């Protein structure tokens, strides 16, 4: 039987780490070669793309932008910049109209400098920031540029001090940091109340399924076989090069292929629409193999 290859999109439930979801999928699919595209904090729900088999090699080529729907709690500051952490300050929030609150969001639209939360997966001298934070260390995490492509105010509840936002942003953006920084800008502090990811790496909620239960762990009907999303469907933003049978043989042996159009990463397909890998087009009218699924000596 051919090894599985493709993507499955999980609607991650609250309370599980992204790694726990990957571990579950390894048991369900009975393969170790499983990886995820974009870590979600345990409390966060929503779209978690899972790559299976050689599709794990395609993760760097997927579009990195993500979309979230979140609720920010003003007036509360915590050690983790969300309600999962220890409350360190409580203040009154300002009496703002919907229009004034929307204007307050303007400095956070576009490309901004953002400091990651103290409790985050950012590497600091080879160690995750959250590991050092658990030891009580306060880390100086430098700001880094992120892009918030759109920031929409969905609802502002003054009585509760809660605002609901939809955020479309670049990879590496922390919505917890956005909540913290907005609270600081308003002079009242703030943290993330809840968060759901609605789009990641080109996959949306409509692609997502509930996290499957391993057959040995369920008491109900047997698990339906999972249908993996073909890898080329996740790479629609890239150009395509279809190979002839002769070119396919050359490709499998790692030889360059004549290629006249475009440059950069290119999806390589067979004549029967099977993905063969990723090539890098160059200015010399060549397509150089970068990821080859059917490699031969």
Swiss-Prot record:
Active-site residues from the entry: 41
Record-linked PANTHER family: PSEUDOURIDYLATE SYNTHASE TRUB1 (PTHR13767:SF2), TRNA-PSEUDOURIDINE SYNTHASE (PTHR13767)
Keyword Ligase annotated: no
Matches recorded under InterPro entries: PsdUridine_synth_cat_dom_sf, PsdUridine_synth_N, tRNA_psdUridine_synth_TruB, TruB_C
This protein's name: tRNA pseudouridine synthase B
Enzyme class (EC, first level): isomerase
Gene3D superfamilies: Pseudouridine synthase
Record GO terms (molecular function): RNA binding; tRNA pseudouridine(55) synthase activity
Protein function: Responsible for synthesis of pseudouridine from uracil-55 in the psi GC loop of transfer RNAs.
Keyword Nucleotide-binding among UniProt keywords: no
Enzyme Commission designation: 5.4.99.25
Coiled-coil ranges (or none): none
Domain of life: Bacteria
CDD domains for this protein: PseudoU_synth_EcTruB
Gene Ontology process terms (BP): mRNA pseudouridine synthesis; tRNA pseudouridine synthesis
Alphabetically ordered keywords of this record: Isomerase, tRNA processing
One matching Pfam family: TruB_C_2
């Amino acid at each position: 039987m051919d090894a599985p290859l493709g993507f499955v999109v999980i609607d991650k439930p609250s309370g599980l780490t992204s790694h726990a979801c990957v571990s579950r999928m390894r048991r369900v699919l009975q393969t170790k070669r499983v990886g995820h595209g974009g870590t979600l904090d345990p409390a966060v729900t929503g779209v978690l793309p899972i790559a299976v088999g050689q599709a794990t090699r395609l993760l760097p080529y997927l579009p990195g932008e993500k979309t979230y729907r979140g609720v920010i709690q003003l007036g509360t500051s915590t050690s983790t910049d969300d309600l999962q952490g220890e409350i360190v300050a409580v203040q009154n929030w300002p009496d703002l109209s919907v229009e004034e609150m929307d204007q307050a969001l303007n400095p956070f639209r576009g490309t901004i400098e953002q400091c990651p939360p103290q409790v985050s997966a950012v590497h600091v001298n080879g160690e995750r920031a959250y590991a050092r934070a658990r030891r009580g260390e306060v880390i100086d995490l430098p700001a880094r540029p992120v892009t918030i492509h759109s920031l929409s105010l969905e609802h502002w509840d003054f009585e509760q001090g809660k605002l609901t936002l939809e955020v479309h942003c670049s990879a590496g953006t922390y919505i917890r940091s956005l909540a913290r920084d907005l609270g600081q800008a308003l002079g009242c502090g703030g943290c993330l109340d809840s968060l759901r990811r609605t789009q990641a790496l080109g996959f949306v909620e409509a692609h997502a399924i509930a996290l499957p239960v391993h057959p040995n762990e369920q008491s109900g009907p047997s698990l339906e076989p999972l249908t993996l999303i073909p890898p080329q469907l996740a790479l629609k933003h890239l150009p395509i090069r279809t190979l002839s049978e002769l070119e396919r043989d050359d490709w499998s042996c790692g030889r360059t292929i004549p290629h006249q159009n475009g440059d950069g990463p290119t999806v390589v397909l067979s004549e029967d629409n099977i993905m063969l890998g990723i090539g890098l087009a160059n200015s010399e009218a060549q397509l150089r193999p970068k990821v080859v699924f059917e490699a031969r000596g």
